[in-house]
Curated annotation (Swiss-Prot):
Taxonomic lineage from the root: Eukaryota, Metazoa, Chordata, Craniata, Vertebrata
N-terminal signal peptide: 1-22
Transmembrane segments: none
GO CC annotations on file: extracellular region
Cell compartments where the protein resides: Secreted
Organism of provenance: Lithobates palustris (Pickerel frog)
Superkingdom of the source species: Eukaryota
UniProt KW Signal keyword: yes
Tissue expression pattern: Expressed by the skin glands.
Similarity comment: family membership: Belongs to the frog skin active peptide (FSAP) family. Esculentin subfamily.
Presence of the UniProt keyword Transferase in the record: no
Protein's recorded name: Esculentin-2PLa
Disulfide bonds: 72-78
UniProt keywords, alphabetically: Amphibian defense peptide, Antibiotic, Antimicrobial, Cleavage on pair of basic residues, Disulfide bond, Fungicide, Secreted, Signal
Pfam families per record: Antimicrobial_2, FSAP_sig_propep
């Protein structure tokens, strides 16, 4: 009976150590993942800003073209 308790205690001890090592490794992986998420989020923000600027410029040009077309139609110079 003493050897059974001894082997059970050894298994419990080894299981506890392996569990703590797994948790540390998982924590390290999650910390690395946060950096990647921040980089992706930063890249998306930059692309979003560039897209907004491009759309504003495009809308401005389309507005000018539309006004030119309307004034052309009104004055019947087209």
């Amino acid at each position: 009976m003493f050897t059974t308790k001894k082997s059970m205690l050894l298994l419990f001890f080894l299981g506890t150590i392996s569990l703590s090592l797994c948790e540390e490794e998982r924590g390290a992986d999650e910390e690395e993942g946060d950096g990647e998420k921040l980089m992706k989020r930063g890249l998306f923000s930059i692309l979003k800003g560039v897209g907004k600027i491009a759309l504003k410029g495009l809308a401005k040009n389309m507005g000018k073209m539309g006004l030119d077309l309307v004034s052309c139609k009104i004055s019947k110079e087209c």
